[in-house]
């Protein structure tokens, strides 16, 4: 079979099903990535969300015996919000990162990959394939880099010449020996804007990320957020775009190619106070379609509390007192107490002290004491 012709046929077909960029790579082991992952593991830079088996992350043969090549795909997503609602005193709003706008991208990319699989099976009935998006074993970034989708930027994102880094990535391992594409040369040069601006210093050096410091990771954790990071969250409800928005390669990049990726402004820039008491049913109905809902509502509610503290939003004090007193989840009770201490105001200290009288959880009591300390500092 003429595999070069088949490759061209696949490229042509990909354009008809809404794939913005496609590349082909060999399925040989990712030896350089393996060394980086071992180092990351030794330095404790991993988030815990990734596949723990480094061999599986770097050897496609373990995932599909007889693998010959990997097809990488990229879909561009919007970077600008049309008709964005204003955040103002009394009506403060949070923000979801761009990668969580619209329908869950895992579903969108899986749809494209399934169509690609069906096309290839029709051409080659005996073909073997294994597709994955984000949560699969392989590193999307390493595959895309090898397949010429883009280069791996210092912000730890794949940067494409056509769409910047505002792209979702997915891949398909196959036993078909497609001719590989050439990687794109690194075009970051001496620029360090992303490293310099990272709020928590998570970008240790070019292409190296301490995931446990990354705000995108921190917003997804479920426990108490370490106090050193709370002020740095700002009004972020889920994820962080800072290292992308500052990137010169993203200037002017805003693509609205896929209707299912179009964001609802009220969802991706939501009012903060209503989030504090949203029911499970309402949360699933409103936010269930978004990738940002995958960890459930508690982390987002905790982040909404931190955002209200960031704004020092006095109008939210009654709601925060209600959460501190009555919410069954210790993380939210304690975070609300801390936030009340940050905001301050008449009656706040008394409310915290009264709540302490019946609070049994040690971590919550610690946060309540911390809230009182913050109030005392305001009086000094």
UniProtKB/Swiss-Prot annotation:
GO biological process assignments: queuosine biosynthetic process; tRNA modification
Compartment list: Cytoplasm
Keyword annotations of the record: 4Fe-4S, Cytoplasm, Iron, Iron-sulfur, Metal-binding, Oxidoreductase, Queuosine biosynthesis, Repeat, tRNA processing
Pfam families for the chain: Fer4_16 (PF13484), HEAT_2 (PF13646), QueG_DUF1730 (PF08331)
InterPro entries the UniProt entry points to: 4Fe4S_Fe-S-bd (IPR017896), 4Fe4S_Fe_S_CS (IPR017900), ARM-like (IPR011989), ARM-type_fold (IPR016024), PBS_lyase_HEAT (IPR004155), QueG (IPR004453), QueG_DUF1730 (IPR013542)
Transmembrane intervals: none
Residue ranges occupied by any 4Fe-4S ferredoxin-type domain in the UniProt entry: 178-208, 226-258
Cofactor(s) the protein needs: cob(II)alamin; [4Fe-4S] cluster
Pathway(s) of this molecule: tRNA modification; tRNA-queuosine biosynthesis
EC numbers for this chain: 1.17.99.6
Binding residues for [4Fe-4S] cluster 2: 198, 214, 240, 243
GO annotation, cellular component aspect: cytoplasm
Gene3D superfamilies recorded: 3.30.70.20, Leucine-rich Repeat Variant (1.25.10.10)
SUPFAM superfamilies from the UniProt entry: 4Fe-4S ferredoxins, ARM repeat
Role according to the record: Catalyzes the conversion of epoxyqueuosine (oQ) to queuosine (Q), which is a hypermodified base found in the wobble positions of tRNA(Asp), tRNA(Asn), tRNA(His) and tRNA(Tyr).
Subunit structure, interactors included: Monomer.
UniProt family annotation: Belongs to the QueG family.
Name of the molecule in the record: Epoxyqueuosine reductase
Lineage: Bacteria, Bacillati, Bacillota, Bacilli, Bacillales
Gene (UniProt): queG
């Amino acid at each position: 079979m003429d595999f070069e012709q088949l490759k061209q046929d696949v490229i042509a077909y990909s354009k008809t099903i809404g794939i913005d960029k496609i590349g082909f790579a060999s399925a040989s082991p990712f030896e350089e990535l393996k060394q980086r992952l071992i180092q990351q593991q030794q330095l404790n830079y991993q988030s815990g969300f990734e596949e723990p088996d480094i061999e599986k992350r770097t050897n496609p043969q373990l995932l599909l015996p007889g693998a010959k090549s990997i097809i990488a795909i990229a879909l561009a997503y919007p970077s600008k919000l049309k008709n964005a609602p204003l955040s103002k005193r009394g009506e403060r709003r949070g923000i979801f990162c761009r990668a969580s706008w619209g329908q869950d991208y895992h579903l969108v990319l899986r749809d494209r990959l399934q169509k690609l699989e069906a096309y290839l099976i029709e051409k080659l009935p005996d073909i073997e394939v294994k597709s994955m998006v984000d949560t699969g074993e392989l590193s999307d970034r390493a595959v895309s880099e090898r397949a010429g989708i883009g280069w791996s930027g210092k912000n730890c994102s794949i940067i494409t010449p056509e769409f910047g880094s505002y792209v979702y990535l997915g891949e398909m391992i196959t036993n078909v020996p497609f001719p590989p594409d050439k990687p794109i040369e690194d075009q970051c040069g001496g620029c360090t804007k992303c490293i310099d601006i990272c709020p928590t210093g998570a970008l240790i050096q070019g292409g190296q990320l301490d995931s446990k410091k990354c705000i995108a990771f921190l917003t997804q954790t479920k426990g108490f957020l370490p106090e050193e990071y709370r002020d740095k969250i700002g009004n972020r409800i889920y994820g962080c775009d800072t290292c992308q928005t500052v990137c010169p390669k993203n200037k002017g990049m805003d693509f609205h190619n896929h209707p299912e990726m179009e964001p609802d402004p009220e969802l991706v820039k939501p009012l903060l106070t209503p989030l504090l008491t949203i029911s499970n049913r309402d949360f699933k109905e409103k936010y269930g379609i978004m990738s940002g809902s995958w960890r459930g509502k508690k982390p987002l509610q905790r982040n909404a509390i931190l955002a209200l503290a960031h704004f020092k939003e006095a109008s939210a004090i009654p709601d925060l007192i209600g959460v501190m007193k009555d919410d069954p989840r210790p993380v939210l009770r304690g975070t609300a107490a801390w936030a009340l201490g940050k905001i301050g105001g008449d009656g706040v200290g008394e409310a915290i002290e009264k709540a302490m009288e019946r609070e049994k959880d040690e971590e919550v009591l610690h946060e309540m004491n911390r809230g009182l300390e913050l109030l005392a500092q305001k009086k000094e």
